[in-house]
């Protein structure tokens, strides 16, 4: 990767921008102050080596701010900036969504609105660009090894949070983490470190009251894309059913009813059928195939070619093949024309996906054109929406991004956090149509990771990977997180 800017550890100047504003929320005027700033890491000689960039929203028209809840928010990747959760959901100003499926487009003009679903009335908010993403920078290029990796990334975030807590005197505030996609992995490891009282470099005193996981990546496997010890076609089955429900309309049931019925079938019948393998013959085999096809929309030939075992890429290419289209991995409601065999489609990866980067221009344009100027951010530095780092460290299979290199799994770290921090709660929010971080994995992890069930909540949404896309989903997710912060069950 090449750079358009050069940073010198001897001359790096941290940036800080402040603003004040007011907007109407839930029938009241909310006054707020923002601080957008570099949070610098130094070497033993006092030279700047890296910076996490943060955007803090503080409500100012309250008597006591020192014990107000605060939520720290970030996206995933690894390598993503906070652009999506900032511009798409949490910001005081956010994108305006028009049609649930077809908009936002990737073409201007882009519309933003004062966020009617903001949580700022009850909770201060901090958006985080990790090192090397957004306005966060790796100043000393030789120090990437200290920040790029599951453990290293998490410890830098935890260090930042503790420093922020001290700087703004928020030790008495209830604290929440909200991560999307790989951000859920980050959340589990950060919370695990905090719960255990130490990271790899030092001890920590900050604790978290709750965790919000949007598009879960916490797993019992070595890392997110590593196989788990069960038939994965069974785990992903509810997502297949939901996508089939959306496109092929096999029933008058709601998507929630149909997908949960499909999950029950997968748990009780499909799993047994896959275990039996070739010994399942005759009428019993035909009956199972008929049910699988009913729930997922795939053909008899497709199933026989795969010994009844549905694979992700094959399903996305098959479910509306009769229309000459494939569905998206990130949001199965999105489609595109089938141009190549699905094996070639998979090799092209996200760049060939039906959703792919269709939203990036919309988010990036609105963030840079409206949202950051409203925060008085005036930066010559380029905003890096996504950093691929390099081929070695970006690979999930590389030891740097492999939790087993340190021992345990991300599910183990989440259990460590919840068991060691009495009262900590976790809320999993996943889209039915998300075939990247399928909701079935949430149910599986919660049944196998030894989590305290009375403090874990799961809710599916009628959306894809970024579940807040659409005005209705923004409102629903906001109301649910609001209930979670208030100590209520967010699923009710």
Per-region residue spans from a language model:
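Alpha/beta-hydrolase fold catalytic core
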Residues: 281-436
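N-terminal cap/lid subdomain of alpha/beta-hydrolase-fold enzymes
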Residues: 2-4, 46-146
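Short alpha-helix in the alpha/beta-hydrolase fold that links the catalytic acid
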Residues: 424, 438-448
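Glycine-rich nucleophile elbow surrounding the catalytic serine of serine-hydrolase chemistry
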Residues: 179-192
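Catalytic histidine-centered segment of alpha/beta-hydrolase-like enzymes
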Residues: 464-473
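A catalytic-pocket lid/entrance helix-loop region that shapes and gates access to the active site
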Residues: 94-96, 191, 195-296
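Alpha/beta-hydrolase fold nucleophile elbow
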Residues: 170-182
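Alpha/beta-hydrolase active-site loop
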Residues: 120-123, 130, 147-166
């Amino acid at each position: 990767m090449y750079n358009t800017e050069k940073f010198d550890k001897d001359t790096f100047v941290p940036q800080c921008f402040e603003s004040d504003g007011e907007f109407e929320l839930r029938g009241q005027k909310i006054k707020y102050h923002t601080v957008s700033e570099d949070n610098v890491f130094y070497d033993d000689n006092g030279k700047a080596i890296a910076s996490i960039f943060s955007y803090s929203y503080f409500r100012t028209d309250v008597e006591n701010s020192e014990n107000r809840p605060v939520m720290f928010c970030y996206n995933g990747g690894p390598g993503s900036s906070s652009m999506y959760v900032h511009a798409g959901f949490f910001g005081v100003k956010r994108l305006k969504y028009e049609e649930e499926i077809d908009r936002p487009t990737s073409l201007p003009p882009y519309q933003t609105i004062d966020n009617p679903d903001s949580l700022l009335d009850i909770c201060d908010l901090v958006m985080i660009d990790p090192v090397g993403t957004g306005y966060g920078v790796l100043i000393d290029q030789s120090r990437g090894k200290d920040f790029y990796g599951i453990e290293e990334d998490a410890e830098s975030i935890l260090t930042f949070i503790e420093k922020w807590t001290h700087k703004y005197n928020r030790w008495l505030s209830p604290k929440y983490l909200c991560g999307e996609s790989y951000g859920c992995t980050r959340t589990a490891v950060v919370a695990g470190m905090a719960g255990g009282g130490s990271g790899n470099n030092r001890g920590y005193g900050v604790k978290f009251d709750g965790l919000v996981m949007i598009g879960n990546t916490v797993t019992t496997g070595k890392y997110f894309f590593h196989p788990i010890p069960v038939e994965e076609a069974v785990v992903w089955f509810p997502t297949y059913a939901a996508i089939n429900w959306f496109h092929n309309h096999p029933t008058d049931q709601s998507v929630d009813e149909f997908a949960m019925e499909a999950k029950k079938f997968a748990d009780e019948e499909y799993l047994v059928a896959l275990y039996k393998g070739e010994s399942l013959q005759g009428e019993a085999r035909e009956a199972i195939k008929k049910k699988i096809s009913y729930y997922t929309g795939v053909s008899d030939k497709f199933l026989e070619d795969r010994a009844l075992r549905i694979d992700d890429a094959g399903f996305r290419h098959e479910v509306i093949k009769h229309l000459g289209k494939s569905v998206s991995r990130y949001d199965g409601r999105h489609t595109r024309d089938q141009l190549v065999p699905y094996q070639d489609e998979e090799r092209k990866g996200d760049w060939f996906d039906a959703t792919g980067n269709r939203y990036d221009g919309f988010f990036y344009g609105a963030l840079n054109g409206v949202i950051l100027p409203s925060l008085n951010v005036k930066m010559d530095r380029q905003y890096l929406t996504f950093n691929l780092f390099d081929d070695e460290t970006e690979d999930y299979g590389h030891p740097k991004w492999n939790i087993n290199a340190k021992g345990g799994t991300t599910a183990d770290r989440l259990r460590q956090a919840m068991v060691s921090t009495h009262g900590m709660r976790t809320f999993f929010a996943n889209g039915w149509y998300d075939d990247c971080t399928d909701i079935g994995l949430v149910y599986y992890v919660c049944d196998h990771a030894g989590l305290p069930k009375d403090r874990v909540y799961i809710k599916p949404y009628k959306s894809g990977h970024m579940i807040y896309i659409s005005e209705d989903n923004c409102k629903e997710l906001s109301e649910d997180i609001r209930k979670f912060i208030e100590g209520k069950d967010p699923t009710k």
